[in-house]
Amino acid sequence: MSSTPHDPFYSSPFGPFYRRHTPYMVQPEYRIYEMNKRLQSRTEDSDNLWWDAFATEFFEDDATLTLSFCLEDGPKRYTIGRTLIPRYFSTVFEGGVTDLYYILKHSKESYHNSSITVDCDQCTMVTQHGKPMFTKVCTEGRLILEFTFDDLMRIKTWHFTIRQYRELVPRSILAMHAQDPQVLDQLSKNITRMGLTNFTLNYLRLCVILEPMQELMSRHKTYNLSPRDCLKTCLFQKWQRMVAPPAEPTRQPTTKRRKRKNSTSSTSNSSAGNNANSTGSKKKTTAANLSLSSQVPDVMVVGEPTLMGGEFGDEDERLITRLENTQYDAANGMDDEEDFNNSPALGNNSPWNSKPPATQETKSENPPPQASQ
């Protein structure tokens, strides 16, 4: 037997401690990783076109971004649409941030028909501030993302609930200004509010006004109208929607029961079976064009069950009805075979055209003549 190698990093592929390859990163988290890389590739010369391309790559056309946090004057909740998302990320860097990335820990994923939901209760937004002092801000909270279930996997909803934040200052900076009380007093003050800069907070407050004005701005851009005319048109259309009569509530359509159509064979077989059971004599069938009301009494008709357009329950059982026709005489016309034999539905060589052999009853009715002695 060969001895085990002394290399501590060696592991035999046939041993119990075989090291497998690292599994691939989960796709939704990988999209956040790609977004972090794209934010790191930002330069000081990045203009609005760069931010629009960034938002187009990672956000859907109807995406929404929501931030929830609590300030000194109470809880706040801001929701912005797709057109305002690029400007939101740009204001983060305009407030003195040099680096921005998100860290997701222990995220939970749920797959739906057309979307993937990622719920991360331990999300950290890390921002590096170069102004006025080098400070690292860690904003912790819960991040809920909804991705589209397609090849692009863009974000449809972004909801970040901030719980707490921490501002970290390097010890080296404190040691450099240990003899300067003014600088130490400045370093002791927070540079953010709940991890957000003043630029970002002011922009979110402005979005409260800008979000309802998206319709006015889009109309002005499309029809080249003056702001006053755009406002008049929007107000008139909104007034029309308000005074318009309410739409009638959609009534649930009644489930219609379909009755199975009686074919030629089923009609003839059912009538023949009923005749055999009632009279106990020869099997006789009626014509194929007889209506349902002219059939033999005590006919049991089974309706089709409701397969679509309703919930399954007692109403979806097969409906069995009994048809009674007191005007119909079962003994009238059943013994007349000429109409049946001359029916065009039967061929010339049909076995039904041949007359059945004489039975004992016919022999008794027509006795043969006796020979004269």
Swiss-Prot record:
Ubiquitinated by RLIM/RNF12, leading to its degradation by the proteasome. Keywords: Nucleus, Ubl conjugation. It comes from the Eukaryota. Residues 263-280 have a biased composition (Low complexity). Residues 341-361 have a biased composition (Polar residues). It holds the Pfam family LIM_bind. This is LIM domain-binding protein 2. Residues 298-337 form the LIM interaction domain (LID) domain. Belongs to the LDB family. Residues 244-291, 327-373 are annotated as: Disordered. GO terms for molecular function: enzyme binding; LIM domain binding; transcription coregulator activity. It comes from Homo sapiens (Human). GO terms for biological process: epithelial structure maintenance; hair follicle development; negative regulation of transcription by RNA polymerase II; nervous system development; positive regulation of cellular component biogenesis; positive regulation of transcription by RNA polymerase II; regulation of cell migration; regulation of kinase activity.
